Amino acid sequence: MASRRLRPVPRLGWRAPITGLRGLVAGLLVLGALLAARTARADRNDLRLINLCDTSQGNGCGWVTQTPTRTTVALDPAANTRFRSLMSELGVVVAPRLQTPADTLGFAGIQLSADVNVTQISSGKSFWNGVEGVQPNNPNLTRPPSWLTTVGGFVRKGLPASLELGAGAVNVVQSGMWALQGYLRFAVNEGFHDLPLPSLAVQAGVSDLLGTDQATLHVYGVDVVVSKGFGIAGTWRLQPYLGWNQLLISGASGTIDATPACDAATVAGTNPANNVAVAALPRSCQAQAGTSADEGGNFRFPSQALITRSRWFGGAKLKLWKLFLVGQFAWTTAGGSRDAQTPMGAADDQSGSQKAVSLSAGFDL
């Protein structure tokens, strides 16, 4: 009796893409750790929250009271509103986004992409004083740009059961701030290319801001996306899509130095009997020489409740072979959430509506 030849079992093709995805995610985690420890020179769009204090009258920050024995900080009643509004608009700038139609990539699919995004901000409002590029003693002299630009890269990996996982990072241009982003998508309905049925997907995403010690900012999003694909000339494929996104923004203050001109260690180490050494100190803290009074100048904005924003978006993906280009427009409604429990009274989100335009290009592998 002739022996039967056993056929080799084919290897599944999704192992290599998953290995590559794991490598990229690991790389993003390493990048995040490096950015969190980074102490690079601040640029014009980096946060500087002490600028939210009005010093235009030439008397220094009105929040600060310095005496020979102590330094105290008392925020003005509108300070928490300015902080909340700034976190709201910055949260929209770095909110999770991935410009894609509703269809997933399939369990063996993987996508690599790069994107550029410009998001409108209320640059003329006082809460945008809280960046490095604004001079607090003359805040109208230089203002932030009306549109903030972010650039980034993303990877998407298809999974079984109509699931898809994605990760990426974006940089706020002219700043040291980055946001690490990730999302999970589930396609409720997809693949009916020959029927007049649209694809429908739901998605949950998260974005964490790194590269600043002024604040921690976490943005969570839940999306609903609907799309329909069309073939063009048997070569191109066009997939228009529309969607709605609910954003939940959690912003918390870091430790802020209200007397940045005074170094607490230098002040404490200065002999008050040494007139030359005392004269070398900034005038505002000369009376505190030899004391630890300047340490009272560190403060935090009070914790606040979640900020909620709604965003509508639409775009189209144009694909040729493995190459694709996506254009998207988004509109986020003006903020209106309120936290009535802060120690200084209610903090209102006074952010304006924000438009955004994005372009993304890459490869479907």
For the regions a protein language model found, what residue spans apply to each?
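Residues on the lipid-exposed face of transmembrane beta-strands in outer-membrane beta-barrel proteins
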Residues: 94-96, 100-101, 112-114, 153-159, ...
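Residues that define the transmembrane beta-barrel architecture of outer-membrane proteins
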Residues: 106-108, 146-151, 176-182, 216-222, ...
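Predominantly the C-terminal beta-signal and adjacent terminal strand-loop region
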Residues: 43-52, 317-365
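Transmembrane beta-barrel domains of Gram-negative outer membranes and organellar outer membranes
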Residues: 42-192
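Transmembrane beta-strands of outer-membrane beta-barrel pores
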Residues: 116-120, 169-175, 186-188, 204-210, ...
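Extracellular loop and loop/strand-boundary signature of outer-membrane beta-barrel proteins
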Residues: 138-141, 168-170, 208-213, 298-302, ...
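Outer-membrane beta-barrel translocator domains and adjoining extracellular loop/strand segments
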Residues: 124-129, 177-182, 211-217, 251-261, ...
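Outer-membrane beta-barrel translocator/channel fold
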Residues: 199-292, 296, 356
